[in-house]
A protein has these predicted regions:
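Donor-nucleotide binding loops and adjacent catalytic segments primarily
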Residues: 192, 201-280
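C-terminal "capping" alpha-helix adjacent to the active site of nucleotide-linked donor transferases
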Residues: 331-348
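Acidic donor-binding loop of glycosyltransferase active sites
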Residues: 279-288
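A nucleotide-sugar donor-handling region in carbohydrate enzymes
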Residues: 151-214
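Conserved N-terminal ligand/cofactor-binding loop architecture of enzyme catalytic domains
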Residues: 21-97
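A short, well-ordered alpha-helix in the C-terminal region of glycosyltransferases
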Residues: 348-362
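C-terminal alpha-helical cap of glycosyltransferases
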Residues: 362-375
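Active-site and donor-binding regions of nucleotide-sugar-utilizing enzymes
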Residues: 69-168, 173-176
Length: 375
């Protein structure tokens, strides 16, 4: 029996989603595999985990530009060294888990898990394969620390593979599989049934609007953009998802009522029906987290990017814009003009959908698991 640990960390939801997709795929498609899913930071030190995840979310929410500076400064120099040294110290606790479980493979969807395991391998306390699964569309050097002890790097696209190779990672270690994706986004759904269940019309184009966000970024800007969509007269209907942000849900509902658009706008809080909703949508409006981006591309959906967190999400937005699958609404853009241009230009929408499907790596999770388990 093979033993696998998949580590993630709770700095944003994407690392857990990617880790869970790998675990679910292996459990569904492989026999004789014992696989565990563990939050590495929560496991090694609950207090450190609480302090650092709270600091990350508060910075991203309240002072995003400051977070952007941290992101770039942690590529190298003192900040990068502090992070690496901290993970070396924290690895002592992780070592006990690894010694008890004796995994054949350790997978990490966050650089901290990779650093801890690579350091233990360097110290000859760990003797197994280490795999890193990168969950954005541009590399950050934190992923590459102690890379000589890492066996696999799974990245989102070929250009990223070239970038890692230029940073000294051997080509044979790098696989452009794409970011792990839940199988739910690959299923075929009965569109008429889904439209009916959400009270939506088959005669209108559907916009899926992710407006809450994990960190409630850019409230006033989000509401301004949302209002422009709600007021738009291009025969559209909107499903707005506020996530766990109750205040944003109230703001959405108030705006919809004020504009008397209840028939054309549905406001939801957290929902597990995102795969179904994407299957009936024509456009996604979202901040460009790695996982939401991956899911949108897999469903062949053009993306309107709003409120990217400085750092990784701005890099994701740049990648999407460069590949002509997204329109990035920036600070002083005329949102109404952008929307009218988009909805009145069906050729442009079709081309964006085609490019999204071409850019997507829908078999990402399957391909990662095949490489890890040497099928």
């Amino acid at each position: 029996m093979k033993k696998i640990i998949v580590f993630y960390a709770s700095y944003g939801g994407g690392h857990l989603s990617a880790a869970r997709s790998i675990k679910e795929y292996i459990e569904t498609n492989y026999e004789d595999v014992d696989i565990r899913l563990i939050d590495c930071m929560e496991y090694v030190n609950k207090v450190v985990n609480k302090v650092t995840t709270t600091a990350y979310s508060e910075m991203a929410k309240k002072v995003p530009r400051a977070w952007g500076k941290v992101y770039w400064k942690s590529q190298a120099g003192p900040l990068a060294q502090i992070s690496l040294t901290s993970n070396k110290v924290l690895s002592i606790k992780l070592n006990k888990l690894l010694q008890d479980f004796q995994p054949d493979i350790v997978v990490s969807t966050h650089p901290f898990g990779t650093q801890m395991c690579a350091y233990l391998k360097k110290q000859r306390k760990l003797n197994c394969k280490i795999a890193t699964v990168m969950t954005d569309y541009a590399p950050h050097d934190q992923w590459l620390e102690l890379n000589e002890y890492v066996d696999y790097y799974f990245v989102s696209h070929e250009e990223m593979k070239r970038q890692l190779n230029e940073k000294g990672i051997p080509k044979e270690k790098i696989f452009a599989t794409g970011i792990p994706l839940s199988n739910k986004f690959l299923l075929r759904y009965d569109k008429p049934d889904i439209l009916k269940s959400f009270g939506l019309s088959p005669e209108r184009k559907t916009v899926l609007f992710f407006g809450g966000g994990e960190f409630g970024l850019g409230k006033s800007k989000t509401l301004k953009i949302f209002k422009t969509f709600v007021e738009n007269n291009n025969n559209i209907q909107i499903v707005a998802i506020s996530g766990k942000n109750e205040k944003m849900k109230e703001n959405f509902e108030h705006l919809v009522t004020e504009l008397d658009k209840q028939d054309y706008v549905k406001v939801l809080s957290y929902t597990d029906k995102v795969p179904e909703l994407m299957s009936i949508s024509d456009l996604v409006v979202t901040k460009p987290g790695g996982l939401t981006t991956t899911e949108s591309l897999a469903c062949g959906l053009p993306i309107v990017v709003i409120n990217p967190i400085p750092g990784q999400e701005e890099e994701n937005a740049t990648y999407l814009e460069k590949n002509k699958v997204a329109i990035w609404i920036k600070e002083n853009d005329d949102v109404e003009e952008i929307l009218n241009d988009l909805f009145s230009n069906q050729t442009k929408m079709r081309e964006m959908k085609i490019r999204a499907r071409l850019l997507s790596k829908k078999n990402s999770t399957k391909d990662i698991c095949k490489i890890l388990l040497k099928e």
